[in-house]
């Protein structure tokens, strides 16, 4: 379907070469200041034509808010946003071979099988142009999360092809065992990431190696994949649902819905499978003396006296999630992107009707590697997941706070989303 989320619902629309793309966002809290200026920076980070190693398609991707705000303030009603497709070239796809042959590893064939008809230009609905609506909606979610809780979301390119920022070694099979990676998790900012354009890998040497590799594949009319790592800091504890809607499951759902994704791992991930439990377990320690980040100190939660979690963990192999529920530590995960399917090299493939084979040389304008522009898309989907989980937790505890206190419990104040909570105690304790 084209809708994501339960409480913060985002519906995207549009195809690669239609007149516009965009979204409708339902569930935005009323009373938040919001203009296009809050959304445009992320749109600009996502847009094509950023450098010599991205698609040359010339789109400004200027977002227009159509509804849901008045005088720059959210009304609590659905917010509609659109971006015009200004540099459409459907004629690039109307040549004889691309009408006859489905592109290898693209969605041409599968969309035709599903719908019985498909867009003849670009990837249609499967195009990365669809993610414009996601990024616009994610910017709204992110603003609320930062104002309310001081949440910070930062993604960066962690590998391109065989070039890694933190290559696996015998000592560090997972980056989560590497002190340098954990230092990066706690300190990386978007400003730092964007100072390493065009690749967005926050290390000068690795960034150069990755750029050279992408350039090599571009010059050969080929493509190469890679990974994007994302960090979410200052997340309230208690987010996520048991069983089927665990927080990491919802993050995986969100990330694997992004075009060209092929893999997802959270925390220590697959490398953590090689680490013994005696090392992998994250011991709890008191968070009493933990330094409060400036964004948290300035948040609505701090102003309203909502306490920070009482505990934190000494290590963070779990990636900030245990039992499917956030524990307050930084959440980090990695998303794998395949090489872009559309390449300029000639490829032998079958016709749509399967009666013969021929040679397809795809036309159009495409990224030799999608990972540099995937960074803000990953951030946006992360924001949508956390926003939805926050609203679910707020709804649950608001409903609970209106009930009379249970006789066998003692109220211990407020939880990390700002509602009264109770601690279970023995009846003998109540008599003392």
From Swiss-Prot:
Q: Keywords in UniProt for this one?
A: Amino-acid biosynthesis, Aromatic amino acid biosynthesis, Flavoprotein, FMN, Lyase, Multifunctional enzyme, NADP, Oxidoreductase, Stress response
Describe the effect of residue 16 to A: Does not affect the flavin reductase activity but reduces the chorismate synthase activity 70-fold
What pathway is this protein said to act in by its record? Metabolic intermediate biosynthesis; chorismate biosynthesis; chorismate from D-erythrose 4-phosphate and phosphoenolpyruvate: step 7/7
The protein's matches in SUPFAM superfamilies, at most eight in alphabetical order, are given as: Chorismate synthase, AroC (SSF103263)
| MF terms (GO), sorted A to Z | chorismate synthase activity; FMN binding; FMN reductase (NADPH) activity; riboflavin reductase (NADPH) activity
In short, the EC number is 1.5.1.38, 4.2.3.5
| Biological process according to GO | amino acid biosynthetic process; aromatic amino acid family biosynthetic process; chorismate biosynthetic process
Cite the domain annotation text: NADPH binds in or near the substrate (5-enolpyruvylshikimate 3-phosphate) binding site, suggesting that NADPH binding to bifunctional chorismate synthases is embedded in the general protein structure and a special NADPH binding domain is not required to generate the intrinsic oxidoreductase activity.
Name of this protein: Chorismate synthase aro-2
